[in-house]
Amino acid sequence: MLQVQTIPSRQDNYIWLIKQGNQAIVVDPGESAPVIERLRQQSLNLKAIFVTHHHHDHVDGVAELLALYPQCAVYGPQITLTDVPQLQTMRDQDLISFPDLDLTFTVWHTPGHTAEHIVFHGHGALFCGDTLFSGGCGRLFSGTAEQMYHSLQRLASLPEDTLVYPAHEYTYNNLSYCLQAEPDNVFTIKRIKEVSKLRQQGCPTLPSTIGIEKQSNVFLRTHMPSVAVFAQNSSELYLENEIQIFAILREKKNNL
């Protein structure tokens, strides 16, 4: 199992640090200072940076980290960091291997939040940026509802015990919306109580798991009759399929 550490960043971001011996990989460093502090505290060398998409709260720390760790490799989608010569452009199904660390990750292209968004999975963990949140999913910027629906369905196909590491602490608010759609979902009722307690203690609610998300995340539950009814009641048009249901769910969440 991977050793994954949480580095809180900005208002509600998480930078994930994968530790293997004295080497580290960080995911979506939206700022450099907390990463540098953690690396120095634990005498770690920065081996690589994983970037899921181009938004500032995911990439603003990259330049300063590379200045301190010039041998560090960067893996991300093509349009993410056009001014970073170390960037190794990742495409769907690419493999990232670190033989000296005995680590290999698979890249999936998951458009929706942005057109270029990618995720990294391996060793029972999924680093999913702003595609999948605990209880939710990312807003649609340069991607479409259809793309995001298919991206989420693809992530849902991973083993249920896969640990899910999103880039934001949105769980409580997301689950509140899920309960609007499924007020009788016993699992979600229990989950939001656990999440509330964690937040009161100042603890992260992450990682989640694919299994937890399939039982509580309304955006992975468009096949459920109660969710379809909730979406239909929010739409003036007849919803013919799960993609349309998803689109209405996302639009309604945007307006809360």
From Swiss-Prot:
Q: Which residues bind Zn(2+) 1?
A: 53, 55, 113, 130
SMART domains associated with the record: Lactamase_B (SM00849)
> According to the lineage, what is the superkingdom?
Bacteria
Could you list this entry's UniProt keywords, alphabetically sorted.
Hydrolase, Metal-binding, Zinc
Could you provide one GO biological process annotation from this protein's UniProt record? methylglyoxal catabolic process to D-lactate via S-lactoyl-glutathione
- Pathway involvement of the protein, from the record: Secondary metabolite metabolism; methylglyoxal degradation; (R)-lactate from methylglyoxal: step 2/2
Q: What is its EC number?
A: 3.1.2.6
Question: Which SUPFAM superfamilies does the record cross-reference, listed alphabetically?
Answer: Metallo-hydrolase/oxidoreductase
| Catalytic activity, as annotated | an S-(2-hydroxyacyl)glutathione + H2O = a 2-hydroxy carboxylate + glutathione + H(+)
What InterPro entries does the record tag this protein with?
A: Clx_II_MBL, Glyoxalase_II_hydrolase, HAGH_C, Hydroxyacylglutathione_Hdrlase, Metallo-B-lactamas, RibonucZ/Hydroxyglut_hydro
Give residues annotated as binding Zn(2+) 2.
57-58, 130, 168
Cofactor(s) this protein cannot do without? Zn(2+)
Which principal EC class is assigned to this enzyme?
Answer: hydrolase
One Pfam family here: HAGH_C
| Details of cofactor binding | Binds 2 Zn(2+) ions per subunit.
Q: Any idea which GO molecular function terms this record carries? A: hydroxyacylglutathione hydrolase activity; metal ion binding
Coiled coil start-end: none
Q: How does it assemble?
A: Monomer.
What this chain does, per the entry, is described as:
Thiolesterase that catalyzes the hydrolysis of S-D-lactoyl-glutathione to form glutathione and D-lactic acid.
What does the similarity note say? Belongs to the metallo-beta-lactamase superfamily. Glyoxalase II family.
- Protein name as it appears in the record: Hydroxyacylglutathione hydrolase
Question: Which species is this UniProt entry from?
Answer: Tolumonas auensis (strain DSM 9187 / NBRC 110442 / TA 4)
